[in-house]
Amino acid sequence: MGAKPMYLTCAFVIEEGFPMEKLEEIAAAMEKTAKEAGVRIVSGDTKVAGKGQVDGVFITTTGMGEIREGVQVGGELAKPGDAIIVTGDVGRHGCTILLAREDFGIDADVTSDCAPLWGAVKECWMPP
């Protein structure tokens, strides 16, 4: 929040027997998106879980960035009257994940793009 993205770490938990081609496809998509966002993937970790212990693959990422000098960021600094910029439907991503992971018996066409936002917000970050 409020930082120029620079680095990304990732950890994979991969189910035994997960297709290597699918893993390569995921890694290639991560590489492409990182390049588009101007971010370097600098660290990674993999663990293999037994068949049936995970649903295919779980990926956890951590992003690190640069905060412009003299700028303070943090949710605790929010106050009444501040502007909040929303880049999509509130709750869409969480709803998408829940529908993909759980069997609620609901048929809904809900997707989440998880797109990098730096290109859209960097004008706000750059000094005048």
Model-derived features with residue positions:
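Helix-biased detector of long, well-ordered alpha-helical tracts
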Residues: 1-128
